[in-house]
Amino acid sequence: MKTRSKLAAGFLTLMSVATLAACSGKTSNGTNVVTMKGDTITVSDFYDQVKTSKAAQQSMLTLILSRVFDTQYGDKVSDKKVSEAYNKTAKGYGNSFSSALSQAGLTPEGYKQQIRTTMLVEYAVKEAAKKELTEANYKEAYKNYTPETSVQVIKLDAEDKAKSVLKDVKADGADFAKIAKEKTTATDKKVEYKFDSAGTSLPKEVMSAAFKLDKNGVSDVVSTVDSTTYKTSYYIIKVTDKTEKKSDWKSYKNRLKEVILKDKTSDRAFQNKVISKALEKANVKIKDKAFAGILSQYATTSGSSSLKK
């Protein structure tokens, strides 16, 4: 839910701001929302009060993206897909799902709309990425591609322990595989891996170190930091086999296709470019200065003015 909420946070404020904005078009801005002795709070009063808040800014952005992508790609995401994603998340949270929704400021329907908008944007980005499957991009991906490498890995949690184990595995006659099985602190005790440069089974630093080694070569201690827990782990790698890279990029076309699509769809700049084009196609214009900057992250050199005013 956390990932999807980045795209559509603050649905409750969205409901208030968007609804009141709509109401102001149907009724007078002076319509009373609250009355009290000696004073009143009008639609305009409330709108002016909340529209500059961070939640309202995010909510208006969400509403714009929802409308634009639903208009342009609405038939590409079915209610069934949305429900499946919703139910999967609900199952993961179990009995705490309702509480999680409430804490996120979401209703069930609001969260489903959030999921739908995210899926629509993802679809648009994937379709745009497919257009990047050019021969030039295939050749560029091939230059940076390393075919399958087989390794044995020892994972350790302490640097001093890693240095001690490194001495053991580099000693004459050392049985790396045996030491790896005895010393690794990996929860699954796995020590044998195969991967190419597009793999994700091990940290990038570990794979990069492996690619630099010759067959039967043993690395020094390689440290990595988990981006989620910020915990440092230490690795010692031995390469047991290396696949020679073929000279024709077409030999790896299917794998390179995966690489290109993954790189593009995960690239924030590319995502923003796709969203920018959709906004320009919809001729989105911001009429209230309070929201003038909410689309600035999607503004491009051409057409940026239409996204700002």
From Swiss-Prot:
Domain of life: Bacteria
EC number: 5.2.1.8
Designated gene of the protein: prsA
Keywords of the record: Cell membrane, Isomerase, Lipoprotein, Membrane, Palmitate, Rotamase, Signal
EC primary class: isomerase
Lipidated sites in chain (N-palmitoyl cysteine): 23
Protein name in UniProt: Foldase protein PrsA
Job of this protein: Plays a major role in protein secretion by helping the post-translocational extracellular folding of several secreted proteins.
